[in-house]
Amino acid sequence: MGKKRIYELAKEINVSSKDIIEKAQADGLDVKNHMSTLDDASEKHLRNAFKKNTTTTKPEEKRTPKFRSSKTGKTVVKKSDHPAADGTKGIQRLKSSNNESTTRNNNNNKNGNQNRNNTNGRPNNNQNRPNNNRNQNNNRNGNRPNQPKRDEKQDRIRASVAEAARMAAQANREIANEKPQANRQRTNSAKPGEQRREGRNNQNRPNNNNRNGNNVNRTNNNNRPNNNNRNNENRPSRPNNTNQTTNNRPANNTTRPAAPAATTANNSGEKKQDRFSGRNNNSRGGNRFGNNQNRPFNKENRKNKKRNRKAKRDGRMKETTNKVVTVRKERPLPDVLEYSEGINVAEIAKKIHREPAEIIKKLFMMGVMVNQNQSLDNDTVELLAADYGIEAQQKVEVDISDIDKIFEDEEKNTTNLVSRPPVVTIMGHVDHGKTTLLDKLRHSHITEGEAGGITQGIGAYQLKHDDKLITFLDTPGHAAFTEMRARGADVTDITILVVAADDGVMPQTIEAINHAKAANVPIIVAVNKIDKQGANPNHVMEQLTEYGLIPESWGGDTIFVEISAKLGQNIDELLDMILLQAEVLELKANPDQNAAGSVIEAQLDPGKGSIATILVQQGTMHVGDPIVIGNTFGRIRTMVNEHGRRVKEATPSTPVEITGLNGVPEAGDRFVVFDDEKSARAAGEERAKRAQMEERKRSNHVTLDNLFDSLKEGEMKKVDIIIKADVQGSVEALADSLQKIEVEGVRVNIIHKAVGAINESDVTLAAASNAIIIGFNVRPTAQAKQMADSEDVDIRLHRVIYNAIDEVESAMKGMLEPVYEEEIIGQVDIRETYKVSRVGTIAGGFVTEGFITRDSGVRLIRDGVVIYEGKLGSLKRFKDDVKEVKRGFELGLTVENYNDIKIGDVIEAYRMKEVPVE
């Protein structure tokens, strides 16, 4: 059996949770609130304890729930919704039907009618009325025979009953006029032995439906809440054909004659209603007489409502007039008024705890007329402070938007310094084994997920060696990612230079050495791939000595470790060297100050928004901290470590991925945590404004000096490109690589570059600009793809940067106008000429060199001078048109639009050949 909570046990044994908690705590059980759980033994103990209490104490009678009427303001007894009417019980005899009786018989008779005892001294006119089914005249009680036709004696009895009812109705009306308030509240009480529901006012209400010509009397006993303020009126029949009545009606709700026992039988014949009996008739248009007796009470209710409204209004007015005006306590003046440049009266009033009107009055007496929003100069502020007898001190303004200065100040903080893990950057040439080394260190498979085996983004990871943490940054090795690698060198403490033993020093190896030296970062050389055939570690050492990296074995200070990342050889030795170098550097940070650090990578996620991978360099970052990163700001919503788990804080040298920024920062931006969100927002907005102004300043305006260059650029063709990538570093790298492509006569024009998937806005821009969209590790959305198909926009998707660069270069070369050069293909000597009308001069000749074609261009040369240049009109051999005549054959030809051909002329045939762009 499972554990049970306190509130569940309280419901089962009908005891409040508070009592159970007090009892459990008194017995030494470990419970705190109603959600605490109990084992089986504790539950059994508490059940027995409260069972004994309930058997020894007398059961408390259930109190009738009361509520305060929203209309009259009086407390009335709340009724239950529906009484249970059971027509199967036997008929019980009425007990104590005396007018002065205070008990009520709540037993149900067999016909479903309930007898109600009158408690206000009125005659009890309730009667048991038959419950006849619709369209049926048979008696539901089978043991009662139908009554025969009335005799004269019964007629006399009925007449006397009607007379008695009329007299009773008249008496009740007189009583109601004298005491209209007597019927406001009716209390019901039951005998101790009777079972009844508390707070119910059972009423016998007739349900008279005239259907199919039969006058069927149906009694529907519905107990409804007794609302004091309802107007007493007999409403038309509802769907259930029950008339609701309230306590604001006269005491004789249904003044029916006290019929003898013979009248309780169900008569199958027609049954007449007494005109003056005051019964509730549910037929439409009924109750012509019974409803008139309620009119005095309706008037009285309206008067009562008016009196109540007037009393409430008078009470509110009285409270307003008697309200005491609180006197504001005057706060003491501060010792020093600290003001800033351009402070106004309203701000001074807040600082010295005085009203602005008082300060304006003082300034007016000094001859200075200002309002509370006007700025005051420093002299006026000092005079005002002297008048109040306090010292004025100008506040030193700090530029909170200069986060670089704040970052440097945080780095210089030398209090509460503790050791921190080293940050290690792995650098090297393409395919020299950087990612494989990190893969071996982390026991994961990063390389398999990289496109083409090349690391396309920057990653940050932590691992533990000898109970000490080491943070690794994996910067990509391709030359296009120079900026990313430079940013990685700025945040690192130690650089591991991976060099393949079979390849030696390569261009990116030299570049990595220069970055590390520029950042004053110590270098540990890892000579990789020593397991391969042809590996020569000594040759690598000789090459690196040219760049100042001399091994310790050769008398230098550079650590060299020969490893095999693939086999895991000497990996532990490399980690030991890293920890040894970290001890020499004495890396420390203050975890108690506000966090500061750098952005490793940033991207826009469709589900999470702006995401930034950051490295905390100083202080401790917490979830919820207000932060400014570059030109963006926000409050940290989530922090995720390299394993994808959420963390609440990040200590120095810890890489985390954060969300909650208002934009995507640039990779390499610095960040600073502020004390409050207001300051962070102000700093972020100010930095964004300054960046926008600098961008506008960088825009090139046409001057006389650069006018010619601008015109020359206008002659050049351009390739409009839109770049979308997964991370900011990839966007920058791809843009720089494309702009470095050199094709004479064509230039790259990047009209838009951003992080994220290719969307409809990008396609719209490309369609308007006739641009090509290049997606790097991203895909277009379904809507964007559909729009691109309809707009004929070219979208090129790539995962490797080489392919993207080559494709754009090919497109640039294809945009140049084709270059043609002339090629001489043949020569014809003219030996005979014929003049034919309608055709012109026909020349007969012999092909001496090459060949001549029908579509080739020709030149007519006479005595070494070109006389005419044009096209062939026709080319024939004998009488047949031919396309080509080769060397050694005779031919006949005509020159288009030229007839001055003479014997001895030479016709040179040529064609224009397209030269490919280099």
Curated annotation (Swiss-Prot):
Compartment(s): Cytoplasm
Record key words, sorted: Cytoplasm, GTP-binding, Initiation factor, Nucleotide-binding, Protein biosynthesis
Compositionally biased residues, Basic residues: 302-313
Domain of life: Bacteria
Region (G4): 528-531
Protein family per UniProt: Belongs to the TRAFAC class translation factor GTPase superfamily. Classic translation factor GTPase family. IF-2 subfamily.
Region of interest: G2: 453-457
Protein name: Translation initiation factor IF-2
Compositional bias segments (type: Polar residues): 180-190
Compositionally skewed regions (Low complexity) per UniProt: 95-146, 159-174, 201-231, 237-267, 278-296
Function: One of the essential components for the initiation of protein synthesis. Protects formylmethionyl-tRNA from spontaneous hydrolysis and promotes its binding to the 30S ribosomal subunits. Also involved in the hydrolysis of GTP during the formation of the 70S ribosomal complex.
Record lineage: Bacteria, Bacillati, Bacillota, Bacilli, Lactobacillales
